[in-house]
């Protein structure tokens, strides 16, 4: 999920990223993570050129230690991404999920619904209706888009 800080000082989604798709044909999970990392680097490169930014700032949500599910695959994916960023000389910073939640909602214990409500209050974008019409609970990709919005906002407008 890609957002950028535009010249009118607003956080905007990158439209061209939505016109490209990450790779779907892969041989193994590690191959998939490598293809996704390469696609991400390509998107960052295109953004840097398209918007003529002298410096690219990247922020990544760090691991959540209470995560359930495919935590090892997530770690492998993130490790490959960080490695590729370093190979391409892109600097990045990490932010803890609780720090991001506190920044967005004033509470580090907020849930996905709280994050979405705050996002909607700020942007008036109805992501839930667009991406998960049948679902009542907030889930991917809606929660991922909300998180990426607040990651960008945190980078551009850090807390004092």
Where in the sequence are the language-model features?
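Phosphate- and other anionic-substrate recognition elements at nucleic-acid/protein interfaces
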Residues: 1-160
């Amino acid at each position: 999920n890609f957002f950028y800080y535009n010249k009118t000082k607003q956080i905007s989604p990158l439209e061209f990223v939505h016109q490209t798709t990450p790779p779907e044909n892969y041989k193994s999970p590690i191959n998939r993570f490598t293809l996704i990392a390469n696609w991400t680097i390509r998107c960052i490169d295109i953004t840097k050129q398209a918007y003529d930014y002298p410096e690219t700032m990247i922020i990544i949500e760090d691991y959540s230690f209470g995560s359930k599910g495919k935590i090892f695959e997530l770690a492998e994916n993130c490790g490959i991404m960080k490695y590729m960023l370093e190979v391409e000389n892109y600097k990045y910073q990490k932010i803890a999920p609780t720090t991001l939640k506190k920044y967005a909602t004033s509470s580090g214990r907020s849930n996905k619904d709280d994050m979405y409500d705050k996002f909607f209050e700020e942007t008036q974008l109805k992501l839930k209706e667009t991406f998960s019409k049948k679902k009542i609970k907030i889930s991917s990709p809606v929660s991922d888009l909300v998180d990426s919005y607040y990651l960008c906002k945190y980078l551009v407008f850090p807390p004092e």
